[in-house]
Amino acid sequence: MNVERDQHISPPCLLTKKIPIVDLSDPSDELVAHAVVKASEEWGIFQLVNHGIPAELMRRLQEVGRQFFELPASEKESVTRPADSQDIEGFFSKDPKKLKAWDDHLIHNIWPPSSINYRYWPNNPSDYSGDGFREVTKEYTRNVTNLTEKIVGGDKAQYVMRINYYPPSDSAIGAPAHTDFCGLALLVSNEVPGLQVFKDDHWFDVEYINSAVIVLIGDQIMRMSNGKYKNVLHRSIMDAKKTRMSWPILVEPKRGLVVGPLPELTGDENPPKFESLTFEDYVYRKIIKVLRD
């Protein structure tokens, strides 16, 4: 599969194909579960509506994130990861020399509490360092963890928030095509579209739905399901006039947890397709492969 050949646009007739939408207000848990399974098998992505996360909470979280990226560079760089640090947290700016990704981003561990490092929380805007932002983040985390457990379980997972900032640009690609290392990602965005997914040899736009949560299946759930659920290939497209932002929450196994095909999903007629590895080893191998490519 040569993804690069179709990096810019799919035929207009295909762009109208809709990403699955799952309505969590449906009183039938069986129907909701069926919809999640079907979307995960066929697409590896779906949009959740009526998910229970208050729209006002999502708005407040986005407002504070936008304010941070509008600060002077010196303010943002005050929470940059030190050069000798192994942390994945902090502010990261785009590298004009590499041009593989055209976004700035800010990363926070948000769950469990023992993983949170406030050294990477900005002092400005004031809502970031005060009780306001922390309370909003805690409330949002509670909602997201509850939502994740409702969809797939995973009470022992780790949660990482990544805020992506794509300023207006004539560049076509904001983030190149990739699948996520994690188990799954729960993403919200501002009103500027740009997320695309690859299916049936074409790229499809993900429709913006106000207050929806986009769920993307990652590598670990794909491996645990022995390939039954797709780890969706996706990318981000820039807008020439408007700033696009997104707030994915990455749901990850603990670093030392061994992840591989579940025994109940394998057998003589369906042998394991993937090697069982600790999540840490998997991430290391994938990073090495990405760097080589």
UniProtKB/Swiss-Prot annotation:
Transmembrane segments: none annotated. Its EC number is 1.14.20.6. It is an enzyme of class 1 (oxidoreductase). GO terms for molecular function: flavonol synthase activity; metal ion binding. It catalyses: a (2R,3R)-dihydroflavonol + 2-oxoglutarate + O2 = a flavonol + succinate + CO2 + H2O. Pfam families: 2OG-FeII_Oxy, DIOX_N. Pathway: Secondary metabolite biosynthesis; flavonoid biosynthesis. Its cofactor is Fe(2+). The keyword Oxidoreductase applies. 2-oxoglutarate binds at residues 164-166, 244-246. SUPFAM superfamilies: Clavaminate synthase-like. Keywords: Iron, Metal-binding, Oxidoreductase. Binds 1 Fe(2+) ion per subunit. PROSITE patterns: FE2OG_OXY (PS51471). Residues 156-253 form the Fe2OG dioxygenase domain. Fe cation binds at residues 178, 180, 234. Gene3D superfamilies: B-lactam Antibiotic, Isopenicillin N Synthase, Chain. PANTHER family: 2-OXOGLUTARATE (2OG) AND FE(II)-DEPENDENT OXYGENASE SUPERFAMILY PROTEIN-RELATED (PTHR47990). Belongs to the iron/ascorbate-dependent oxidoreductase family. This is Probable flavonol synthase 6.
